[in-house]
């Protein structure tokens, strides 16, 4: 995991230094993981935290036809989760409609990438 996070950070640095925008999608459950991702590029990094309760996510996972690793995996992820604060992440409640969630994400991202 650590090598993968370090590699993502290095690739992000290369793109940022070349003047390009980067989007990384991963769980980054722990603060230490987010610290590795943002090392030396923190001012350029912004997190979006898609928030839902464990029960909401469990119900959604059970509705998937071809993917569900069971409640144990979800429980372990919630146990490992170190919630980001509003100071270091834009938090979106994903119990809203998909359209509402995607619009909020777009509204947050657009000013960051508009040069």
What are these regions (language model features)?
Residues 1-40, 55, 67:
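ATP-dependent small-molecule kinase phosphotransfer cores
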Residues 41-60:
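Conserved phosphate-donor/acceptor-positioning beta-strand/loop module used by diverse small-molecule
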């Amino acid at each position: 995991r650590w090598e993968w996070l370090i590699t993502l950070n290095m690739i992000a640095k290369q793109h940022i230094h070349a003047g390009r925008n980067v989007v990384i999608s991963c769980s980054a459950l722990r603060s230490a993981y987010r610290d590795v991702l943002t090392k030396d590029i923190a001012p350029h990094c912004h997190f979006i935290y898609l928030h839902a309760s464990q029960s909401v996510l469990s119900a959604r996972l059970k509705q998937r036809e071809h993917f569900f690793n069971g409640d144990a995996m979800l429980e372990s992820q919630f146990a490992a989760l170190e919630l980001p604060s509003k100071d270091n992440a834009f938090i979106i409640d994903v119990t809203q409609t998909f359209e509402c969630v995607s619009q909020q994400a777009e509204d947050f991202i657009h000013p960051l990438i508009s040069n």
